[in-house]
Amino acid sequence: MPLTRTLGATFSRYDKDEVRARLDWAPGLCTANGLLHGGAVMALADSTGAACAFLNLPDRSQGTTTVESKTNFLRGVRDGYIEAVSRPLHTGRTVVVIETDVRDQNDRLVARVTQTQLVLT
């Protein structure tokens, strides 16, 4: 994905049961206070979630589009990296629901994201 490359994220696992990607902390991805920007956290989670949804599409589907995305931010990140892990919660004919946990380098939960993806036919 172009955005994922622009952010500098790297995927380490890419299959229908789980998609993982890592994003290193960088000053250009931060708020004025030096915290990793929530938009960067959400962009990583959205990218892994979209990939997971795509891998779980029913036969003869064209793709997905996000109809809802909810993020709970639980802690800030001032250094190191984050890793997003996306897993399917529901894979239906018309909707795919993905849950993504974003953790810091110490395995602390940074954010939990739930995405609902409409299946395009």
State where each predicted segment sits.
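Short, charged/polar surface micro-motifs in flexible loops or helix N-caps
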Residues: 16, 26-29, 47-50
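Hydrophobic residues in beta-strands and at strand termini
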Residues: 23-25, 73, 119
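A conserved, well-ordered hydrophobic junction motif at loop->secondary-structure transitions
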Residues: 25-26, 30-44
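Hydrophobic beta-strand-centered segment that forms part of the acyl-chain substrate-binding groove
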Residues: 52-83, 88
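HotDog/MaoC-like acyl-thioester-processing domains
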Residues: 75-121
